[in-house]
Amino acid sequence: RAAVSRDFVVGARINGNDFVEGGNDLAACTEIAKYLEPYVDYFNVSCGVYASAPTMIEPCYSPEGWRKNLAKTIKAAVNVPVIAVNTIKHPETAERFLQEGVSDFVGMSRMQLADPDVVKKAMAGREDLIRKCLGCMNCNKSVVAGKNLHCAINPVTGRATVYGDENLVKTGAGRTVAVVGGGPGGMQAALLLKKRGYYPVIFESRDHLGGSAVLASKAPCKGMVAELIETMKAEMKEYHIEVRLNTPA
């Protein structure tokens, strides 16, 4: 703190619980926050260490907002703003936690990977178009492997200089392209084609979109897959993409 001026913002990322035997629990982490408070302008509260990795970067079976008590407890003990990550996947959950005093700001890192426009869409009342993080850990897997950051449901993540909307080469000129299959891959292909100026037509032999992902969404802890299907169906309507159900290609 002494190395910078008072108007230079200094924050601290701290745990609310290490979730390992012999580590810092919530009480200890709260005391650490109180000790650091005079030296920082805000706290960013997370939890877990590598020995308790599923609490640090939660997979699909972790309930949304499961650790809210950690940030709320620390927030009540200090007088500087608290940012909290909380496995937030829905804008209304983020807003509710703000109203409940869980934190002053909400961190939604993986949601930003899944859909960088999540806040813009929420403000416009278009939650139906928000692609919500599945908790599939694909992003973490790519980083651990030393590769570029990628997202299973947003092919633009890590490739924006090529596939970002502003960089797409629009050479379609209205030409019709048949897309065989209305699963997530088919719908994503149709969406990209539409943005490039083509006229995609999805041919789906079944009476619904979603492909094998519909079955996958029935498995335990896979409810977010069902939400992804509904979001992509909404995208098909938003971009006026023609869909022919019960029509084998």
Residue ranges and their predicted role:
Residues 178-246:
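Beta1-alpha1 glycine-rich phosphate/pyrophosphate-binding loop at the start
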Residues 1-180, 184, 188-200, 208:
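Flavin-dependent oxidoreductase catalytic cores
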Residues 249:
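Phosphate-bearing ligand-interacting subdomains
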